[in-house]
Each structure stands twice: as structure tokens, then as C-alpha cells.
């Protein structure tokens, strides 16, 4: 490779000193020559900044005036970063020193690929795929996200079964390697999302703009997960359900959204009712609040979330069936059981 693209590894932090202490040392071992590590601080109230000043004085820190969340936090920061590629990296991710090179090689070999992700394994159990992306994200016809190596809450062991580079629907927000030009072309993350599912929405818009997303399993990272909002947190449940509906309303063709969104709301309410029956009232209320917030968005904010769209053809990484039925009724636990010959 004659040209050595510039890579900016950008880590968003909010009151995450403990994660910086634990995971930043591995990132600083990155061996790719033309890279810069940038910490974006979402107005932390802990001593993250003093820790960085004392232990990593050479790292660039971008200070934001308030906690903008994941979406706007990155949008604000990346306006100030000049690089060929952005490595959007969660603060709770451990990496190998040579993790960047395979992704640069893949992206440089195919200019139609706008973003890719490494294989994401669990930091707690490094034999397992991790929930947030695993070996590359897919989506079903009703907007349920899943991944190669993770279907709903079931994460597979990694035996190299997904080690072939392949096109996917979405790239993990825990470790997203993206062309800076494309990120700005599609207007970055939707800031209304605040956090959760914003990377899937971004990747959907990237495909609508005519680009592709890919896995890059030759690069491997280890994600702790749940650093800011642990799984099961009602705030996380609310954001996931609200943002998923907004994403469908924004990106589905008109001929599909009129029936898919009501059916998706029905499926959500089935899940909420199940939560109520087993005594999880918080889960039930979070979904109801998410639906009310979605209705509010439709009436008052939908016009603010208009992004360029150019492609109407088939999207890659879409499972054109009902994942809920296949998983919970037919008992298909793993990606290969669900998708079979479609990847």
C-alpha cells in the first residue's frame, strides 16, 4: 500500500475514568503508523480529565460543554477532526496493537465500502461474541437488529465460523471504522437518537446513499459493554424501542412503512405485556413511553430528520422474514440457523 491513510481513533468519554484506566493502555499500543488518538469528553463530572492530563498528556482531548450523548457528541467532535478514516471506538474496548491495518487494507481495496467493523468479542469471556455487533450486523424485515454471532440475547462461541469478509447491514457503534468523507456526506449520526441504534440508522442511510458496509474479522477487539447504561436499564429499553421505530419511519419506503410499523408496534406490545406478566413493570412502562415518544416525534420532529436518499434497490444484510417468529416460536437460536444461505 503506497498511500498511508490518516486514521483518527476517537473515543467518547462521559464519567468513564475507570474505563480509560483499564482500556486506554491497549489503544496506545496501536502500531499503525499514521494514527492519532483523540478523547472526546462529554462534560464529565468525575476526574477523567485530570487523569488524562497526568497520564496521557500527549493525547488530544476535545472538551464538550455538556453531555450530548453518543450521537451529537461524536457529531460535534468529528467536525474538528481531520483524517481519512474515523475509528469510532467505545471507551470500554480492548484492542491488539495491529488491529487497524486489516481495516485500512479492506477499505483501500474497495472504495464502495463506506465503513467496516472488526470482530467484536466479549471482554468478560473472550471465546464469546459480544452483543454489540459480534461479527457484523443484520436486520430483519420489521427492523429487529441481530448479528453474525448474536441473535437477540444469545451470543455464540467464536470458532472462526464467521471469519470470511462479508457485506452486512450495520456496523457496530462500539468499533466503527468509517470514511470521514462518507460520515459527513450522510450528515453523521441523527442527534435526536441521543444514544442507541444511531449506528444502525447511520448505516441504513449509508446504504441508501449507494455505499456498502462490511465485516473485517481479521481485526479483533474485546468489548465490555453496558458501560454507560447496563442492559436491562429502563432508560436503555426506552431509547432502543423509541429509536428503532424512528429509524423505520425515516428509512423505510412509503409502501412498506404503513404496515410494517403498526405490526412492529404490536410485537413490541406483546413483549411489553410479557414483561408485565412476569413482574417487570419497568420494562412495560419503558416500551409504552417509547411508543408515546415515537408518536410525538412523528407529529413534531419528523421534518427535522430528513436525510439524502438516492438508492431504492435491495439493501445488503437484510433478512426478509420475521426474526421474532423464527427465534421464539421455531427455536432458531443462531445466525446460521436463521439466515442459512443468505450470506
List the predicted regions and their residue ranges.
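Short aromatic/hydrophobic "clamp" motif used to bind/position activated sugar donors
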Residues: 86
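A recurrent flexible, glycine/aromatic-enriched loop bordering the glycosyltransferase active site
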Residues: 137, 141-147, 152-178, 200-202, ...
